[in-house]
Every structure is written in C-alpha cells, then in structure tokens.
Amino acid sequence: MTANVPMINSHSAERRVVRTLVVDDSVVVRTVIERILNADPHYSVAHKTSNAEQALGYLADHVVDLVLLDIELPGQSGLAALPQILRKNPSVKVAILSGKCEEGSAAAVEALALGASDILSKPGSGSFGEQFPQALIDRLNRLFDERPAVPSMQRHVTSPSPDNASAPLACIGIGASTGGIHALGQLFEGLAAPLGVPVLLTQHLPASFTVYFAQQLARMTSLRVKVAETGDLLQPDTVYVAPGDANIQLRRSLHGRAMVLLNPERTASGNLPGVDPMFASMADIFGAGAAGIVLTGMGRDGTSGARDIVAAGGWIVAQDEASSVVWGMPGSVVGAGLTCAVMEPLGMMNFVARRGKVAA
C-alpha cells in the first residue's frame, strides 16, 4: 500500500472545515483515512480511535461534524454505538465505513435505520486503490454540500394547521433519500391510529436493499408493508415500497380501483426509483385527495411531482431543515412554495391524517 494520497478535486470552495472522528480498529485504515481527509481543505481529522468506548468518551467532551464508523470493533460494535453517538450529538453525521456492510445487507439497512447518514464500502487491507480517495471525498461532499438557495424566511418551520384541505384524503405518497430510513422510523413511530388510506413510498435505494428495507420498515409500523408489484390493488393501511429498479405509478383497474403499474424507466433527473413519477401518478388518479410527504435527501427529486399534486388540489408536507440529514429534496419543495407545512417527521403522519379528515 502506498503512503501517497492522490490529488483530490473538491468543488465546495467556501464551505467550513468538517471536523471528523475516525473510528476503526485498523491502524492502517485510520492512517489512510486521516491522510485522505487532511489532504482536502474542507476536512480535518480531529481524532482517531480504535474502539467505540474511546469514541464515546471523546464525544463527551468534544464536538465533531462527522464520524466515520466501522461496524466490527473490539468490544462494543459500531451498530451498538451508533444510537449513543447520535444521542451525544444529534446534529453529527455518521457515515459507516466498513467492509461488512455490503450493498443490500441487513447490517447496512439496520445502520441506516439507526440513523447513519450513508454507507461507504471500505476496501480490504492493502487494497486502497487510486480511485478510493476521490470516491470517499465525493460521497462525503454530498452530505455537506447540499443546501439549496431558499429565502431565509422560508427556512423556518411553518405552523401546521389542519384547515384548508380541499378533499378527503385518499392516498399518501412519501419520498426520501439520504437519511430517509431513520426519518421514516420517526414518521411511523408518531402514527397514533390507522390511516384508512394506502401509502406509497419511494426511498432512494438500490434494488438489492429493497427486501431488507421492507422488512425493517415492517418492524417500525403497525401498517402492512410490501414491496410494490404491478397489479397490486391499493389497500388502506398498507405501505407499498418502490423496488430499487422501478418507479411506482398508478392506473385504474377495469373495476375502477387504483392499481400499481411499475415503470422501469429512469427519471429525467437520473433517479430510479423516482419520487416525481410517483407523485405525478397520484395527482392523476387521486387529484385533490393526494398528499405528499418529502423527507430528507439529496437533489430535487419530488419537486416536479409535488407541483403536479398541488396543481390537482392536493398538498405537500416537507421535513424541516434542522432534522434533515440533507435538506435538498425538502428544501427544494419549500423553495418552490409548494408546502402547506414544514415540520420534523415525528408528527407528520398524524398531521396528514387530521388534515385529510377535516376535508371529509
């Protein structure tokens, strides 16, 4: 393994330095990561440690912006330590850097559900190639660069009111990306009673994650959860999860019922699955009875579809900036003036249910 770190292109010139804690039991990995991050002007390794106990001790007295956390550690595991890290510093971003969190694994989905901001694959010992430093910086930049230009007056949480829904609630659509699994846990945790309507969910995840994700989600809620399939007739109090290789769209069955029609075409923004086609299809089928929820995530997926829902008489709720891992998707719909409320996930589902019943 070479000690040289390739030149890294970092595109955010005015962002403040991200103070980082590296937690890995390999001295080689800790050294390589430190060299990579310190070679970039936007990152600084504040501390390195080999186990979770020392990391928690450091965080008791110090504040960092980012924790790079391995899963397999001596003593307490990284997964066991993750909730404790977030309790000590709720605003910190934790990226799992592990060779044991393969794409689609149960450990990866569990880490995301526990609050990890991202999952990064760590090369095996001695195999840190020339591509890894830039790939690492690029992934971390996505966590810290995404701040759309939204007027400051629109960044505040709006006071949610259940008034002014123009039609009874018929369907809820949820879109999420980075940080979304943890936000979904909070969202469903706050649900006090059955909804009485179907829920469509698009979370940006590869297809290999879908089964584990649906299983994890089923443990978060009393609602029925299934991976959406073409031909599914929408049932109330059922969550239909978009598979990682298709968009959820809807059509009417021969008997007039709303039915799932999966579409494998990638959206114009490059997302698959995409929130935009799901929202647009909800607007077509349910009109003013459609309600959309936009949770934390990078990019602007969901804004075009949210515009379709609002144009059809429906309404949109977005996650607030303070509770978002990345305020890209929700910030975009807020900036476009499409939201009736901006709030943390815990109260969203009850707010949506109350607002829909007021219209009824």
Name each model-derived stretch.
Residues M1-V22, S26-H42, K48, E53-L68, ...:
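Conserved acid/base catalytic micro-environments in cytosolic active-site loops
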